[in-house]
């Protein structure tokens, strides 16, 4: 950008080394720690804590902040740790400096050996990690040496006692021979006793193993018997549950059947009542239709009678012969059938009258 770039002005502070905050005694934290019993120069942390013995001078210094500008892990540093920061050929140079300073060859060799041991330790740590050797116990063979030595000492003590009691050299020689002959006996007896002990131990182990096997078999039988009992009980319980379920199902089915029968009967009754009501309504409608039809027919008959009377008057005037209407000869019935009978009588009269037929069939009368 050059001169046209934005200018960033940096103002130097009065405390370039950033030591003002460490020397400030008026801050809140400094005053609070003083009120709790801390004095400048003491370690940070509780004095009576379990880890107080591990406090060092670092606990008295300030907490320093370091900017992390690498890809290493937290707390890792380049050139620190085991095997880091060593120069090749430095051992030979240190030996040369030691000789020039007047050190003896023994001291130089000792230092060289220490450096070589350090290199071996570094290599082993890199390859297998930290190794610690722990001292184990002493391996004991088949023979118990302490018991054999004790037996020999006891035999020697017996020999000394017998030699003191005997006075003659012959008796001493004979006693020595006898004791020499007897001396291997306790060892053999000891060996025999050890063999017997071993045999007894083996027999005890066999008997214990047999007992354990018998116990295991008895336990297995008991467990099998218990399992059989549990299975039989479970089967019985299942059967009882099935019986209960079947009974409950039968009762429920019978109840449902009774309910269904009652519902069917109620439906039948309702259907019968509906049919009766429909029949009654139909009969009532038919009666009303008959009454309406009879009223209409009576009106029509009255009109026809008027037409007949008019036609009869005309014919009487023309022909001058009176027309006599024939009576049905039947008495008018009373009741519901009277309307029907009237309608039938009117039809008969109309069919017998020529003028009315002409009017019905739209035939003009001849004048």
Curated annotation (Swiss-Prot):
Polar residues bias spans: 15-27
Low complexity composition bias: residue spans: 282-296, 310-328
Single annotated GO MF: nucleic acid binding
Subcellular location: Nucleus, Nucleolus
Region described as Disordered: 1-28, 156-336
A Pfam family the protein falls into: G-patch
GO cellular component: nucleolus
Boundaries of every G-patch domain copy: 25-79
Keywords annotated in UniProt: Nucleus, Ribosome biogenesis, rRNA processing
Primary residence: nucleus
GO biological process, one term: rRNA processing
Tree of life domain: Eukaryota
Cross-referenced InterPro entries: G_patch_dom, PINX1
Compositionally skewed regions (Basic residues) per UniProt: 209-221, 236-248, 265-277, 297-309
Biased composition (Acidic residues): 167-182
Function comment: Involved in rRNA-processing at A0, A1 and A2 sites and negatively regulates telomerase.
Family label: Belongs to the PINX1 family.
Protein name, as recorded: Protein pxr1
Species the sequence originates in: Sclerotinia sclerotiorum (strain ATCC 18683 / 1980 / Ss-1) (White mold)
């Amino acid at each position: 950008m050059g001169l046209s770039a934005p200018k960033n002005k940096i103002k130097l502070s009065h405390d370039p080394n950033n030591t003002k905050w460490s020397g400030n005694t008026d801050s809140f934290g400094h005053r609070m720690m003083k009120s709790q019993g801390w004095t400048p120069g003491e370690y940070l942390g509780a004095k009576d804590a379990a880890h107080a013995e591990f406090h060092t001078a670092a606990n008295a210094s300030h907490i320093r902040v370091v900017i992390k500008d690498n890809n290493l892990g937290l707390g890792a540093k380049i050139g620190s740790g085991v095997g880091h920061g060593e120069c090749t050929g430095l051992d030979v140079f240190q030996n040369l400096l030691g000789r020039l300073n007047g050190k003896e060859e023994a001291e130089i060799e000792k230092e060289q050996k220490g450096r070589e041991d350090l290199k071996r330790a570094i290599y082993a740590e890199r390859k297998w990690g930290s190794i610690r050797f722990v001292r184990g116990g002493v391996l004991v063979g088949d023979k118990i040496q302490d018991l054999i030595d004790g037996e020999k000492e006891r035999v020697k003590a017996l020999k000394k006692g017998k030699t003191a009691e005997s006075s003659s050299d012959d008796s001493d020689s004979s006693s020595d021979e006898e004791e020499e002959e007897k001396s291997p006996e306790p060892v053999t007896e000891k060996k025999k006793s050890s063999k017997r002990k071993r045999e007894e131990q083996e027999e005890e182990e066999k008997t214990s193993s047999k007992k354990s096997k018998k116990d295991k078999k008895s336990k297995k039988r008991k467990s099998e018997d218990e399992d059989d009992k549990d299975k039989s009980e479970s089967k019985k319980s299942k059967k009882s549950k099935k019986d209960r379920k079947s009974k409950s199902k039968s009762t429920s089915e019978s109840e449902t059947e009774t309910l269904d029968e009652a519902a069917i009967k109620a439906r039948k009754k309702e259907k019968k009542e509906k049919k009766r009501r429909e029949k009654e309504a139909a009969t009532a409608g038919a009666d009303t239709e008959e009454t309406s039809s009879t009223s209409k027919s009576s009106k029509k008959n009255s009109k026809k009678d008027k037409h007949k009377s008019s036609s009869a008057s005309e014919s009487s005037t023309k022909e001058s012969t009176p027309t006599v209407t024939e009576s049905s000869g039947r008495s008018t019935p009373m009741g519901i059938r009277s309307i029907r009978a009237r309608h039938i009588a009117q039809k008969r009269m109309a069919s017998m009258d020529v003028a009315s037929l002409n009017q019905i069939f739209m035939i003009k009368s001849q004048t």
